[in-house]
Amino acid sequence: MATAASNPYSILSSTSLVHADSAGMQQGSPFRNPQKLLQSDYLQGVPSNGHPLGHHWVTSLSDGGPWSSTLATSPLDQQDVKPGREDLQLGAIIHHRSPHVAHHSPHTNHPNAWGASPAPNPSITSSGQPLNVYSQPGFTVSGMLEHGGLTPPPAAASAQSLHPVLREPPDHGELGSHHCQDHSDEETPTSDELEQFAKQFKQRRIKLGFTQADVGLALGTLYGNVFSQTTICRFEGLQLSFKNMCKLKPLLNKWLEEADSSTGSPTSIDKIAAQGRKRKKRTSIEVSVKGVLETHFLKCPKPAAQEISSLADSLQLEKEVVRVWFCNRRQKEKRMTPPGDQQPHEVYSHTVKTDTSCHDL
């Protein structure tokens, strides 16, 4: 007892080490060289999953060598062969059909737990040299294998396994266009018919006394489709697309029928047109009448109200038309004459501020 107390290292050399594993208390090998002990203990603590604490199948060393004989005869050493293509395909199918199997827990690391052939020990090469476990491509940062070493299914298989709602819908544009075309073959007019209708529509619209804005407003009030004056103008000029021309033709045709049936009697179209006319129609003056007005303008650029009334009566024009003509003529004279070359009879026009607001109505 005294000898044992005086030499505490003899206990380590005479007794064997005991490892506390999950399988039970196992007797270890006697104390050896510290360098060899570190290598063997490290290999004992690194199974196929790379976790240093999960050694379930590695037993104690039986001799004093750096590599254990039990490790050489272990199931992993016997399976030190790369899996074949059939095994990989089988593993991919198993992973594709049962994704939850791939995410196994650390307690099922035994090679025989898988249906496919077990993978070789990643920490030992064929020559018996240790490798860095954490540098292997099959390991993650935590040391666990991704999906049990099985490769993910290809992109084509994953696309086919999607729900029909999640898949990319097919292009129905061509199908829809063919369907619409087959459905409206009988009603679709030709380009010649559209051109002829546009000419007839313009002539009849002018004959009835409606403007393009009146037609657009009437279509919006009667049929619920509001069109601007620009749209009607482009239709008459054949500047719309063929599809839009086909859509607008039946509406304009209905408007023409309604306008023709209501000719000579005030109807809703006349009321709508009257509401849409926010300004008066442009008056066209004949050349002879313009000559008389021009002669009177040279004599008196700004006639009085009585002169405008008498001149309108002599020319059989409205008083407002004559007044607007003189107003526009004075504005035109200002634009044509430079500021330094004004005539004496136009000097007084700068003092009149009411004339500057005159416009052609």
UniProtKB/Swiss-Prot annotation:
Q: Where is the composition biased (Basic and acidic residues)?
A: 165-183
The Polar residues compositionally biased stretches are: 122-131
Q: What GO biological process, any one, is recorded here?
A: regulation of transcription by RNA polymerase II
**Compartmental location:** Nucleus
DNA-binding feature ranges? 278-337
Q: Which GO terms describe its cellular component?
A: chromatin; nucleus
Tissue expression summary: Brain specific.
Q: Which residues form the POU-specific domain?
A: 186-260
Has keyword Transcription regulation? yes
Family label: Belongs to the POU transcription factor family. Class-3 subfamily.
Spell out the subunit comment.
Answer: Interacts with HNRNPU.
In the UniProt entry, the disease listed is: Deafness, X-linked, 2: A form of deafness characterized by both conductive hearing loss resulting from stapes (perilymphatic gusher) fixation, and progressive sensorineural deafness.
Protein name per the record? POU domain, class 3, transcription factor 4
**Organism per entry:** Homo sapiens (Human)
Q: Give the encoding gene's name.
A: POU3F4
